[in-house]
């Protein structure tokens, strides 16, 4: 007669089998693998769907397991001293290795606690597919967050992408599913098969994957990022103490896929090839930093990288993670800083990625008024969810700490700050106090910047923020968001609007030139002419310029030199320096052939020389964020469309004069004092740049009857910037 204990055991046993066979088991390790058995023995249980026969290696001998269920459950009774490393099983790929279900968890209680609180700042070591040595055995540990899933399985090359074979176990109440697979190696392709509460089985790429297949394929790949031998230790150490505010910062904004192609065709250059070519180019051209449009994995070329599917994976378009590490290392060895565009505000709706990851609104808000962006047709992160903010903050730290990137430019911050951004009146939900500010996003940004500055001192956090939100670059302690720098979108828009006007009528728009100085020191600004200004029918910078061809090139020289002279750090998007006529096209390389023509060679030489000039002039960068660095000489000459001011740094003073019309002034008087000597040291109208060559070889100093200096008499070249050294 069967005892109650035996009946209970049989019931639990059958329940285990049912859940394994139907792939709905939360704890497959509780049944599969190595377990204590009756009379001091142990039992190994194996699951091979529909298999008729299974062999395993036990203490060096091949033995056959007994099938105990027709769907493919097997067991083998073994001695009590058997351990996880005393037997091996055959995987579907035919390889013999240790049993995944005989190992302890790799995602521990501390991991669960920190993740639940949103403060697991080294989460990138624990989540996703990672090469690991666990209990002395090499393999790959997998962990994925899917709290609302009925079950999660690992599907990969080694198990022939069969979602029944390798169910994962959930770790407590964390929502994290885990599995360690011994013997797996670098290059293994994998995904997660998630059984949703709605009964669907969906296939998802790993949100924490370090590498991915080349689009359009979407599988994640196991990568080794520990093997690379970094040689930039001195750079990383110096970065911690670098006072970047008082140093030159001249950023070259680059889209890797279209900066240059192989042999003038559509094939991409590798990260290693790009490292050598871009480094040599930036050193020659006088750029101190490279800012890359997003290189995190993304499915669509035309998104330019701003719709990210793999936040931890350098895109495979240009090589492997190790190639990207080489890229960063090489830049640092040649004293060039690297900034990445980073997109924590939204993500694409592609079914293989983060969207409705476990069948529910997991990374995004459920309500489309909060969780869907109508302009970009993307999902918006739920910043108030600890696990989501942790995913993003750990991602920022991953790029800055592990991949040695020097800074992040946070994309579309305005869309994060405001709940009504891009929405009509009834398309958004007010915050808890009835306002339009996204309080959760604001708190996320403060948390992000605080942790980055704490853990990665010297790293730059830059905001692309297009509104007048107060305190973007103010410290968190003083109520700000804590960014280091902010793109000066207002100055950029005013400047480009002014330059688009007919030159003889610019006097009616003089305010566009001077208004930016009203707020120039309210934040720490970067003056930018970015990729956004040369696409979607906006024309290239050169094509925006009015006038005949000579005037267009002169205007472009004036535009760039005007930016160089203004307070703030600098950024220029690729292509402007060669005078590209066409808009930027992400599918083709820059039109380098233009440099064979004198006009384009002239603008190229101009950018090269003014960049190097900038680097040598502390007055143009040493006190960028202080009123002390700038003094108006004349901002009111609307009639002639001329402005003049002095830039200061240390003991140096530079007089900058800009003539925004094509008119030549042979006798232009400026009222200026407190100097005894003046020398023209840069002129954008130089013949070598394609200009008319109107120089001030010996500017006349005007004195009063007491022989005190009261002004200057200058020659003003047409459409030109003139820079003088005062002493």
From Swiss-Prot:
Q: Which residues form the active site?
A: 411, 464
**UniProtKB keywords:** Carbohydrate metabolism, Glycogen biosynthesis, Glycogen metabolism, Glycosyltransferase, Transferase
Q: Which InterPro entries does its entry note?
A: A-amylase/branching_C, Branching_enzy, GlgB, GlgB_N, GlgB_N_E_set_prok, Glyco_hydro_13_cat_dom, Glyco_hydro_13_N, Glyco_hydro_b
The protein's annotated pathway: Glycan biosynthesis; glycogen biosynthesis
Q: What is one process in the GO biological process aspect for this record?
A: glycogen biosynthetic process
EC number of the protein: 2.4.1.18
UniProt cross-references to Gene3D superfamilies, sorted A to Z = Glycosidases, Golgi alpha-mannosidase II, Immunoglobulins
Question: What Pfam families does this protein's entry cite?
Answer: Alpha-amylase, Alpha-amylase_C, CBM_48, GlgB_N
GO MF terms listed in the record are:
1,4-alpha-glucan branching enzyme activity; cation binding; hydrolase activity, hydrolyzing O-glycosyl compounds
Does the record's keyword annotation contain Transferase?
yes
Q: Which GO terms describe its cellular component?
A: cytosol
Q: Which reaction equation describes what this protein catalyses?
A: Transfers a segment of a (1->4)-alpha-D-glucan chain to a primary hydroxy group in a similar glucan chain
Q: How does it assemble?
A: Monomer.
**Role according to the record:** Catalyzes the formation of the alpha-1,6-glucosidic linkages in glycogen by scission of a 1,4-alpha-linked oligosaccharide from growing alpha-1,4-glucan chains and the subsequent attachment of the oligosaccharide to the alpha-1,6 position.
HAMAP family xrefs = GlgB
Of which family is this protein a member? Belongs to the glycosyl hydrolase 13 family. GlgB subfamily.
Please report the name of this protein according to its UniProt entry: 1,4-alpha-glucan branching enzyme GlgB
Tell me what organism the protein belongs to. Answer: Protochlamydia amoebophila (strain UWE25)
């Amino acid at each position: 007669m069967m005892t109650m204990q035996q009946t209970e055991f049989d019931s639990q046993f059958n329940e285990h089998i049912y859940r394994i066979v139907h792939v709905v088991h939360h704890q497959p390790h509780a049944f599969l693998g190595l377990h204590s058995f009756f009379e001091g023995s142990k039992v190994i249980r194996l699951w091979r769907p529909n298999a008729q026969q299974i062999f395993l290696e036990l203490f060096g001998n091949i033995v056959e397991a007994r099938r105990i269920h027709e769907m493919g459950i097997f067991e083998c009774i073994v001695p009590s001293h058997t351990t996880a490393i005393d037997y091996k099983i055959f995987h579907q790929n035919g390889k013999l290795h240790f049993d995944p279900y005989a190992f302890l968890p790799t995602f521990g209680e501390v991991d669960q606690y920190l993740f639940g609180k949103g403060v697991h700042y080294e989460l990138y070591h624990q989540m996703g597919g990672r090469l690991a040595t666990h209990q002395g055995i090499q393999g790959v540990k997998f962990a994925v967050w899917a709290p609302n899933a009925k079950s999660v399985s690992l599907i990969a090359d080694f198990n022939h992408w069969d979602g029944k074979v390798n169910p994962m176990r959930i770790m407590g109440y964390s929502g994290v599913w885990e599995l360690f697979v011994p013997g797996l190696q670098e290059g293994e392709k994998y995904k997660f098969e998630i059984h949703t509460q709605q009964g669907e089985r969906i296939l998802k790429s790993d949100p924490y994957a370090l590498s991915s297949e080349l689009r359009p394929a979407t599988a994640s790949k196991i990568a080794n990022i520990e093997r690379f031998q970094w040689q930039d230790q001195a750079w990383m150490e110096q970065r911690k103490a670098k006072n970047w505010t008082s140093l030159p910062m001249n950023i070259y904004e680059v889209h890797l896929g279209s900066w240059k192609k192989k042999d003038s065709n559509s094939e991409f250059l590798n990260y290693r090839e790009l490292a050598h070519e871009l480094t040599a180019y930036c050193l020659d051209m006088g750029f101190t930093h490279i800012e890359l449009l997003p290189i995190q994995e993304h499915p669509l070329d035309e998104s330019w990288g701003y719709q990210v599917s793999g936040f931890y994976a350098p895109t495979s378009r240009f090589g492997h993670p190790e190639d990207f590490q080489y890229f960063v290392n090489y830049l640092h060895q040649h004293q060039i800083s690297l900034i990445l565009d980073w997109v924590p505000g939204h993500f694409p709706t592609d079914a293989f990625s983060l969207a409705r990851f476990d069948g529910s609104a997991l990374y995004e808000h459920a309500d489309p008024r909060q969780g869907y962006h109508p302009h970009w047709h993307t999902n918006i992160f739920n910043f108030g969810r600890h696990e989501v903010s942790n995913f993003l903050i750990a991602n920022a730290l991953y790029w800055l700490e592990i991949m040695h990137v020097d800074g992040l430019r946070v994309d579309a911050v305005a869309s994060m700050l405001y709940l009504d951004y891009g929405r009509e009146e009834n398309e958004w939900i007010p915050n808890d106090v009835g306002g339009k500010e996204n309080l959760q996003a604001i708190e996320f940004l403060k948390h992000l910047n605080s942790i980055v500055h704490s853990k990665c001192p010297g790293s730059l956090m830059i905001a692309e923020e297009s509104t007048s939100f107060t305190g973007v670059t103010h410290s968190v302690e003083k109520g700000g968001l804590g960014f280091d720098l902010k793109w000066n979108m207002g100055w950029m828009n005013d400047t480009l609007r002014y330059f688009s006007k007919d030159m003889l009528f610019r006097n009616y728009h003089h305010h566009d030139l001077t208004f930016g100085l009203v707020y120039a020191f309210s934040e720490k600004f970067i003056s930018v002419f970015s990729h956004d200004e040369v696409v979607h029918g906006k024309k290239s910078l050169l094509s925006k310029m009015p006038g005949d061809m000579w005037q267009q090139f002169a205007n472009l020289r004036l535009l760039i030199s005007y930016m160089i002279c203004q307070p703030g750090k600098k950024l220029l998007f690729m292509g402007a320096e060669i005078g590209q006529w066409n808009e930027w096209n992400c599918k083709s390389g820059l039109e380098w052939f233009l440099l064979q023509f004198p006009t384009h060679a002239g603008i190229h030489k101009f950018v090269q020389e003014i960049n190097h000039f900038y680097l040598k002039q502390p007055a143009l960068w040493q006190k960028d964020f202080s009123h002390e660095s700038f003094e108006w000489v004349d901002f009111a000459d609307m009639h002639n469309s001329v402005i003049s001011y002095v830039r200061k740094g240390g003991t140096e003073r530079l007089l900058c004069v800009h003539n925004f019309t094509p008119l030549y002034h042979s006798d232009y008087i400026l009222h200026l004092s407190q100097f005894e000597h003046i020398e023209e040291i840069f002129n954008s109208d130089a013949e070598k740049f394609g200009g008319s060559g109107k120089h001030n070889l010996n500017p006349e100093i005007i004195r009063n009857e007491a022989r005190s200096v009261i002004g200057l008499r200058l020659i003003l070249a047409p459409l030109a910037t003139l820079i003088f050294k005062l002493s």
